[in-house]
Amino acid sequence: MEKIVLLLAIVSLVKSDQICIGYHANNSTEQVDTIMEKNVTVTHAQDILEKTHNGKLCDLDGVKPLILRDCSVAGWLLGNPMCDEFINVPEWSYIVEKANPANDLCYPGDFNDYEELKHLLSRINHFEKIQIIPKSSWSNHEASSGVSSACPYNGKSSFFRNVVWLIKKDNAYPTIKRSYNNTNQEDLLILWGIHHPNDAAEQTKLYQNPTTYISVGTSTLNQRLVPKIATRSKVNGQSGRMEFFWTILKPNDAINFESNGNFIAPEYAYKIVKKGDSAIMKSELEYGNCNTKCQTPMGAINSSMPFHNIHPLTIGECPKYVKSNRLVLATGLRNTPQRERRRKKRGLFGAIAGFIEGGWQGMVDGWYGYHHSNEQGSGYAADKESTQKAIDGVTNKVNSIINKMNTQFEAVGREFNNLERRIENLNKKMEDGFLDVWTYNAELLVLMENERTLDFHDSNVKNLYDKVRLQLRDNAKELGNGCFEFYHKCDNECMESVKNGTYDYPQYSEEARLNREEISGVKLESMGTYQILSIYSTVASSLALAIMVAGLSLWMCSNGSLQCRIC
């Protein structure tokens, strides 16, 4: 009879109504890293490292770049005859120069403070070329004879378009005294130069005067140049050299020139009509007839991600460059789908928050929720409130990270002349150091946020579990795997009240108490039976052992192996 009662109790327990708290799982193979773990599979993740580009030069926010093709910046500004297509250029967003442009200084020489001029151009978006000293105004000097085979045009000798190489006229080179007053409202970029002949014979042949000078003065500039006559190797067929200079002439300031030879005078100047963020980018790419917000020498980036690893030099509203190969933010939960064999052994699921072992692929409309089973059937239901709060929290966090990082950030290269190599090396080391710091910060940020996100989901599941536990109290039994077994019948309406937090504990407490006492009684009676069996088994085992010992002793005494004395 006791066995029948025990069996009925067990059957009753198996058929008891249950409700379980669980979380979503899917077929995702996305993996993230955290502070504590690597390659954690999650249900949802968001890549925040841009690794692709289009391989083209594009307009930046609708403004075309100035692509100099085979011309250098110096060739463009001075007016190399092979750069005539750039005589007048519209507004540009950035300037593109090849690493080794063919059309540079056609007449060999040097451009003074060239790197500083390029740096200035990185803050300019538009020039307007204006004539300041007409070529026709040099009546006492030859203004058209200053040409060279080093600067050919249509098979003939020519010269830079924007400056004038002044030669003697009628065996005389009268001293030049010229001024230009900047009456414009904008700054002016003015260029001039000096010719360094190969020998004294060339000096007098071109300028008549054996000893010459050039003086240039503004409110901030005081310069005096003298030609350096020396025998040199030929470059572009020329043993002579030219050296070019530049200055920015402010409004209402005047520039004064004085020279008695070797003077390369300005004819045109550049009015700086628009300043803004620009850059000179070294690239061999072609124009792609496209638009972007971020340009690199490798191609354009169209991305809302906060980081990229394409190229450290950028122009526009760009993600920050890092040296990382992978930055993935966890937005979902740990993805550990429940296995069928575990379901048979441990119930419906098993431990995201320390006590649930696997997620539910059957629950597709939320991150956290319930699985119930009763006489009316079973099913999954997401907890919409906790899921929505979690989605909002994770979304806000991801957006916050992107907004903080995805600000306008320009990293343009700095050029240094040959005398500044140590500064250039130091600059590169500093930039590499900054990139290392950015990379470390980005990777650490992702690891920490992923850890927090997964802990956040764990906490939400635990909170949902506690919400149910506090409602049910002793009306149900905790099974230790995220499930509760009711001590009373719980139909679908009852299950729904548990899910929405309106469960009426007093309504079911009496039924639960009676069932709880009945189950406890069955356990006690079963325990009494097991205790009797235990005592009987112990006594029987001891008696059998005593008989075996006595028999062994008698056998040993009979064959002399053991001496027996009875006192």
UniProtKB/Swiss-Prot annotation:
Its main location: virion. It holds the Pfam family Hemagglutinin. GO terms for cellular component: host cell plasma membrane; membrane; viral envelope; virion membrane. A lipid is attached at C557, C564, C567 (S-palmitoyl cysteine). It is a single-pass type I membrane protein. GO terms for molecular function: host cell surface receptor binding. Palmitoylated. Keywords: Clathrin- and caveolin-independent endocytosis of virus by host, Clathrin-mediated endocytosis of virus by host, Disulfide bond, Fusion of virus membrane with host endosomal membrane, Fusion of virus membrane with host membrane, Glycoprotein, Hemagglutinin, Host cell membrane, Host membrane, Host-virus interaction, Lipoprotein, Membrane, Palmitate, Signal, Transmembrane, Transmembrane helix, Viral attachment to host cell, Viral envelope protein, Viral penetration into host cytoplasm, Virion, Virus endocytosis by host, Virus entry into host cell. Major glycoprotein, comprises over 80% of the envelope proteins present in virus particle. Belongs to the influenza viruses hemagglutinin family. Binds to sialic acid-containing receptors on the cell surface, bringing about the attachment of the virus particle to the cell. This attachment induces virion internalization either through clathrin-dependent endocytosis or through clathrin- and caveolin-independent pathway. Plays a major role in the determination of host range restriction and virulence. Class I viral fusion protein. Responsible for penetration of the virus into the cell cytoplasm by mediating the fusion of the membrane of the endocytosed virus particle with the endosomal membrane. This is Hemagglutinin. It comes from Influenza A virus (strain A/Silky Chicken/Hong Kong/YU100/2002 H5N1 genotype X3). The gene is HA.
